[in-house]
Amino acid sequence: MAQEKMDLDFEADTSEGATLRRSNSAPLIHVLSDLSQVFEPYPLRTGRTSTAIMSHHSLEEGLDMMNRETTNEREAQAGMQISQSWDESLSLSDSDFDKPEKLYSPKRIDFTPVSPAPSPTRGFGKQCLSPSLQMFVSSSGMPPSPVLNPRHFSRRSQSPVKCIRPSVLGPLKRKGEMEMESQPKRPFQGTTSMLSTNPAQLSDFSSCSDILDGSSISSGLSSDSLATGSAPAESPVACSNSCSPFILMDDLSPK
């Protein structure tokens, strides 16, 4: 059982004349039960908590800054590599050709010397044959020289007349020529002695012309003689009928 101790103090109050009693009781507890409440003071850790939070935030900010710097460095390196690759692909120099590359690489270029003496207008006097471009590329960046390698010789300009190849079907014929050739050829039925320039034959031709003139005169005389009833005189044309190639109209007339 709990024991209670009570202290009673009697004090006299002179002002009011009344008696006041003050009691001070404090229980004496020697055994703690399970139902008894235990009050513990809450520790104040405000300083420690704020310091830990600030350090944690600063650590996170530091990590974020490191990540951002790493990302920026990677982007800068990627940009530098891209620019270097573009510069290497666009620039042609001897240092690029000395690097070991693959056989079928587009940067692999074989040098073929044009002449033993370098050209005064060319930097190196060499031309590069690019397998990927299938053309000659000058190492100095200038257009290639017109003189090519004998192995890869080809004409750059040719005459348009020489470039025309004969047709497989045969030579072309014009319309007028085809019409002339389509007509059948007629054999020449006259004498070819008229084309000769022999003086003896020319005299025969002159005599034949005289005979023709005489035949016209004799035909007129024969008509007159038939009208008068006298026999015509023998014309000198009859003696030359055997030698003349022409046939007179008097021979064909009925007698």
Curated annotation (Swiss-Prot):
Stretches the record annotates as Disordered: 1-24, 169-196, 219-238
Organism: Mus musculus (Mouse)
UniProt signal peptide: none
Family to which the UniProt record says this protein belongs: Belongs to the FAM122 family.
Keywords, ordered alphabetically: Acetylation, Methylation, Phosphoprotein
GO molecular function per UniProt: protein serine/threonine phosphatase inhibitor activity
Modified sites of kind Phosphoserine: 25, 33, 50, 58, 115, 119, 145
Chain positions with Omega-N-methylarginine modification: 122
Phosphothreonine: residues bearing it: 112
Protein name in UniProt: PABIR family member 2
